[in-house]
Amino acid sequence: MSDKLKLLFLSASPVDEEALRSDVEIRELHQRIASSLDRKRFEVTAYFAVRTSDLQRILLDHPPNILHFSGHGGEEDGIYLEDDLGRVAPVSGEALAGLFAVFKGTLRIVFLNGCETRAMAEAFRYLVEYTIVMNRRVEDGAAIVFATAFYQALARRQTVRNAFALAVNQLRIDRLDADAPELLEGITPVEVKPAVTKARKKEPTNPGTRSLSQPVTNSRVRKMIIIQGDNNSVKG
């Protein structure tokens, strides 16, 4: 990865889903990065109460190397952003793939810290080097512990694989669900053509929850730029 890492933290908390502690997640994340000797390598930008109408603009304004989503997800729906009234507005893996394609080469890691985000990642995993997802429902506290441990290691020059392994191990240390997170490595799509023989053509074998109490307005999409250098709800 390049010397400078731009981390974009996005959170959504629809009113019709259970409230989660995204504020705690970004606070812990920032503290672990800020306490590292390598803290100046990270530039962290955070947005809360993100609506579907905000998503593309935010990425255009802040093209990230790492995109971190903190919120709800569903195996069939994708991740849950908000509509203008603060209600659930699902965004599918295919829609994210269309967005991530624009940032291919810049966007290196996608971290979807919400329930059941594994299935949707198949739509875009070939566009990024690493995708971190949850393969089932996960407790909010466990999700925060996992994310905190991952960035703590990454900020201390560990590889993505090592940072992921240490984050999973932290869940084991704390006796939390260590089987929910998955690390997916990027896939480069290749056109597979059937092998041709004299006799015949041989066909190839193809071998998450957070909520708000008030309607969302433009002013409620809050942004926080973190200056460099310085629980039992279910996430589903």
Show where each model-derived region lies:
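Active-site-proximal C-terminal subdomain of hydrolase catalytic domains
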Residues: 38, 42-45, 105-203
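Caspase-like cysteine protease fold
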Residues: 2, 57, 89-103, 157-230, ...
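A domain-level signal for caspase-like cysteine endopeptidase catalytic cores
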Residues: 1-93, 112
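Cytosolic/nucleoplasmic/matrix-facing N-terminal domains/tails
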Residues: 52, 66, 101, 120-121
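Predominant activation on well-ordered alpha-helical scaffold segments within soluble catalytic domains
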Residues: 30, 97, 147-151
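Solvent-exposed polar/charged
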Residues: 60-61, 101-102, 125-126
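Short glycine/serine/threonine-biased micro-segments
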Residues: 69-71, 155, 227
